[in-house]
Amino acid sequence: MTRLNPYFGEFGGMYVPQILMPALLQLEDAFISAQSDPAFQAEFTDLLKNYAGRPTALTRCLNLTKGSKTRLYLKREDLLHGGAHKTNQVLGQALLAKRMGKKEIIAETGAGQHGVASALACALLGLKCRIYMGAKDIERQSPNLFRMRLMGAEVIPVHSGSATLKDACNEALRDWSGSYETAHYMLGTAAGPHPFPTIVREFQRMIGEETKAQILQQEGRLPDAVIACVGGGSNAIGMFADFIDEPGVELIGVEPGGHGIESGEHGAPLKHGRVGIYFGMKSPMMQTADGQIEESYSISAGLDFPSVGPQHAHLNSIGRANYVSITDEEALDAFKALCRSEGIIPALESSHALAHALKMMREAPEKEQLLVVNLSGRGDKDIFTVHDILTAKGEI
């Protein structure tokens, strides 16, 4: 049986075919031993510093906040090699794969960011890489598709279902169930069956650890709130982990509201879904009346996921974190505002978190508040999507 608790309150677990249990237990053993192995930790830390570029900056937004008493900082995961926070944990998982003697990596990707991160880690560490990607996402994210192929990854289009991230996840798990003796499944978010939610959190927690040290140095106190977008939830749990035991710091997760919650076209299962079992875990998810997984929707491919990581579900259920939603339109406005005010092009995913921070600022301009937004990735991959939308609106 497991050595670590596979549940967060009532959420989580290992709802997988029996054939995959040995692979998950082997992964848990490797993770536990690696966490207490100074050589593993030294190699991981060295890669994060000298290859990925950690620590990332904490940047104050002076222009965006003019006319208000809000002090707003961005944790700059967009500056990380690979363009997003995804690079952190794939380096950790790739080292674990080598520790277990695996020769191949299987991964799924939505926006393509986890695919790019997986491809670069495999190129660096000499692992074969095959990546499942929904056909619809391939259309939305052609630059990332080419990046993956440039770095030697095989990208397999998935045409089944909605041809998006959830379908790519299903295909990747199916592949792994037949190849786990030689392959490691490099799950891209803090979701799925145990031990993945725990592993991914621990391999992302430096985001919050660095933020805490940097904000104390720059402001002399902890923030009033840390804000992060939530799809599966890895960048958010990486930011939240070191602040969970700081009761004075509000944790705010921002789900994609899509065309508006009432439209049904969104990706906000935490607040507007029902608990079920999917992708190896028990967690809130978007379901039809008869319990089928419903298609999620977001302008940002990386948030277009019908469920959410189990630790977020737990933090929501006990009231420790507050989860809100932001529409496509609001995210787009925040995207444009950051470009024009600060000269930073954010990912559309991260723009959801920024939009909520700007909303907090606008609603209380006289309130002295210290906010940190996790800018989880850069927006290079999204410029064509945004270009098409702004062209259609006649804005450019």
Swiss-Prot record:
GO terms for molecular function: tryptophan synthase activity. Pfam families: PALP. It comes from the Bacteria. It catalyses: (1S,2R)-1-C-(indol-3-yl)glycerol 3-phosphate + L-serine = D-glyceraldehyde 3-phosphate + L-tryptophan + H2O. SUPFAM superfamilies: Tryptophan synthase beta subunit-like PLP-dependent enzymes (SSF53686). Pathway: Amino-acid biosynthesis; L-tryptophan biosynthesis; L-tryptophan from chorismate: step 5/5. Keywords: Amino-acid biosynthesis, Aromatic amino acid biosynthesis, Lyase, Pyridoxal phosphate, Tryptophan biosynthesis. GO terms for cellular component: cytoplasm. The beta subunit is responsible for the synthesis of L-tryptophan from indole and L-serine. This is Tryptophan synthase beta chain. It comes from Erwinia tasmaniensis (strain DSM 17950 / CFBP 7177 / CIP 109463 / NCPPB 4357 / Et1/99). The gene is trpB.
